[in-house]
A protein has these predicted regions:
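Alpha-helical assembly-interface signal, strongest on the long, hydrophobic N-terminal helix that forms
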Residues: 2-34
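Long, compositionally biased low-complexity segments
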Residues: 22-419
Length: 419
């Protein structure tokens, strides 16, 4: 029996191992439908006696919200690289949470400012709001901000000649979104790994692609964005990620502007002109803050252009690293906008922000979304249309009952797990 069980597990799904470094036995035997009989029948091919064995306990790759999958990921990376693999991620989760809290707090401030600016704009409808006024007209930065916020962010950020993936897996329920086949019986518990999420994050770059490293043969090209967005099409996931990064960039950009007296003075001059044209010079200070908010928003778009082009953006700006002029803000998103930004060489990259955003997801969410991607890729890219993560066996215990002479029976168990 032991030899037959080992032989069965030796027939692991090779595409799963080659592509994702994960061991698993296809319990459906290329039918797409798991039954215990398929496994037991296969054991008889390797010498087990029919009718003497039954599956006492079993685990599938997706069991316990993907815990079986995560356990293999952790052991694979620990054995291959040791703790060095996650050394640079230690402490990054707390940093990511702190950044998120700042972004949430600043978003409230942004919303309050937006309400004030709506009131200002409503009080002076004659002022040109398009940001593309004709010669001699004063362009309204508040109107520019309104226009930008109503545009699809990806269309403003990404180069005009870059084709954005429109791929979708709608109608193909991933393992995270369907009723799953669950394992049964008692097996040794998977030992908790305090660094599991860090190992999952470290596993991502070598196994899943992103916007900056997309491959067009994949069901979803922006896989890392899917881990964060969870939508079944590339465009939505990319939009979610760009918006999250923009929120992270807004606060430090706005705070820098508050320290730059030259830029504050520029904003105040423009605010004074806008307020005068609105017929209410007393609004200058309020409008100036609105101009600075719009400027920070515009700079955040410039940051996204750098990041998506493969460059880096410093966490905190200086006079030297600030990119967008006030006149450039008024052209942003218009036909006069070049749509590009000079590359940055220091700071955080797009991939760094993806890691930060992934750290904000729960480990359960990451596990199951990884399994979604893994399953879609095996089905659609690696010619395994039958593959189901919840039919992929990782561990099993077989109970055997042998008939001896004189009516004596002998009962024993055989356990096997991919290690």
């Amino acid at each position: 029996v032991e030899r037959s069980v080992e032989s069965v597990f030796a027939e692991y799904q090779k595409e799963l191992l080659e592509e994702y470094d994960i061991f698993g036995l296809d319990g459906s035997y290329e039918t797409g439908s798991y039954t215990e009989d398929r496994v037991l029948d296969r054991m008889t091919v390797f010498g087990a006696i029919a009718g003497e064995n039954q599956i006492e306990a079993i685990r599938f790759l997706s069991d316990n919200e993907g815990q079986e999958f995560a356990d293999q990921v952790c052991r694979y990376l620990e054995n291959l690289y040791g703790i060095d693999m996650i050394q640079d991620l230690i402490g990054r989760e707390d940093e990511a949470k702190e950044q998120e809290e700042k972004a949430i707090d600043f978003q409230k401030r942004e919303e309050e400012n937006e309400k004030k600016m709506d009131e200002v704009l409503a009080s002076g409808g004659s002022l040109e709001e398009s940001g593309e006024g004709s010669e001699g007209e004063i362009e309204n930065p508040l109107g520019v901000l309104q226009k930008l916020k109503h545009r699809v962010l990806a269309e403003i950020v990404l180069p005009r000649d870059r084709v954005i993936s429109q791929k979708s897996v709608e109608g193909m329920a991933g393992v995270s979104g369907r009723t799953r086949q669950e394992g049964k019986g008692n097996l040794p518990s998977v030992e908790a790994n305090a660094s599991e999420k860090l190992y999952l994050i470290a596993y991502i770059p070598d196994h899943f692609k992103s916007y900056t490293k997309a491959e067009d043969d994949r069901p979803l090209e922006y896989e890392q964005e899917y881990l964060i967005g969870g939508k079944q099409n590339d465009m939505e996931n990319l939009q979610i990620v760009l918006n999250k990064i923009r929120r992270f960039r807004m606060a430090p950009n706005f705070l820098y502007l508050q320290t730059d007296e030259t830029k504050k003075a520029e904003a105040k001059v423009l605010a004074g002109i806008v307020s005068a044209l609105l017929g209410n010079p007393g609004l200058t200070e309020v409008v100036a803050q609105g101009v600075l908010m719009a400027w920070a928003y515009g700079e955040s778009i410039m940051d996204l252009r750098v990041l998506t082009a493969g460059g880096k953006v410093p966490s905190v700006k200086t006079k030297e690293t600030w990119k967008l002029s006030l006149s450039g803000l008024l052209k942003l998103g218009t036909t006069q906008d070049s749509g590009s930004s000079s590359a940055g060489e220091s700071g955080l990259s797009y991939e760094d922000y993806l890691k930060m955003l992934s750290l904000l997801e729960t480990k359960e969410t990451l596990r199951m979304r990884m399994l979604d991607l893994l399953e879609w890729n095996l089905k659609m890219r690696l010619n395994c249309p039958f593959f189901q993560a919840d039919a992929c066996i990782t561990r099993m215990r077989i109970q055997s009952i042998c008939q001896l002479r004189r009516g004596i029976t002998y009962q024993f168990s055989t356990y096997y797990a991919y290690q």
